[in-house]
């Protein structure tokens, strides 16, 4: 570990394999001081795509694995950290995508940037978070969606909680949640809090052999936005293409950011339920339709973002999204 600290502190970039080894050492055989020193040195130098991919691979190596018999398998997960208190867009979008027939392995945690993260809102809906891997696999295979609460599937992260808290600043671990799905989802929509991270995380995903992904920053949000243009990098195997999309790309109208404002877990749970049942319309539904449409697109269920949005809207209007929420709530509520 000392060698890695010295190399990074001197401005040297780690290879993917070295970064993968470094995170394994952080989890298994490093002091708090060493953990803090390496994370601080990486932040000061600036993390490269190889270092991000290597850390993510190391985290996945140490994770409790979920292996449903589904291909492709989609996740909608952002980095958080965008400092907007919106509704739970990615969580609601995951339910809608699953309702459209796209197998979904949702990975999430408690709040980072808002009053309610994925785990907060699902907890408010009565979904059991501490789920067994085999049960999650069964839910994905049977109902089309399963939820993985990150702390339950990444026990190695316990070793870095203290040093991260003591540093008090963002580190490489703030980027890794979307890249470390325990089910190794091979089709992803990844939101990032900084537009400069869009190409970096896209190249990291490509190096991790993800089949298809969209990495997006939407006018300040780690989601596709309605209040402005979104910068998006599409990963298709080894190819990464960056472009800009607008709400009209999805066939949707623009709306101010305040129109998708959220609240605490209970309020966001009510919005989530209202959106998937079709009772809540307007911009909150539209931003979910856009992001679910993106998930449907990367999951192979549509040949364009607009077509994906159409399928997302149909999943809501047909009752399929509501059925998916009911299945997730009923199944996870009885698991231990």
UniProtKB/Swiss-Prot annotation:
It comes from the Archaea. Keywords: Amino-acid biosynthesis, Aromatic amino acid biosynthesis, Glycosyltransferase, Magnesium, Metal-binding, Transferase, Tryptophan biosynthesis. Mg(2+) 1 binds at residues 90, 223. One of its GO terms (biological process) is L-tryptophan biosynthetic process. Mg(2+) 2 binds at residues 222-223. GO terms for molecular function: anthranilate phosphoribosyltransferase activity; magnesium ion binding. Binds 2 magnesium ions per monomer. The keyword Magnesium applies. It catalyses: N-(5-phospho-beta-D-ribosyl)anthranilate + diphosphate = 5-phospho-alpha-D-ribose 1-diphosphate + anthranilate. Pathway: Amino-acid biosynthesis; L-tryptophan biosynthesis; L-tryptophan from chorismate: step 2/5. GO terms for cellular component: cytosol. 5-phospho-alpha-D-ribose 1-diphosphate binds at residues 78, 81-82, 86, 88-91, 106-114, 118. Anthranilate 2 binds at residue 164. Anthranilate 1 binds at residues 78, 109. Belongs to the anthranilate phosphoribosyltransferase family. PANTHER family: ANTHRANILATE PHOSPHORIBOSYLTRANSFERASE. This is Anthranilate phosphoribosyltransferase. It comes from Halobacterium salinarum (strain ATCC 700922 / JCM 11081 / NRC-1). The lineage of its organism: Archaea, Methanobacteriati, Methanobacteriota, Stenosarchaea group, Halobacteria.
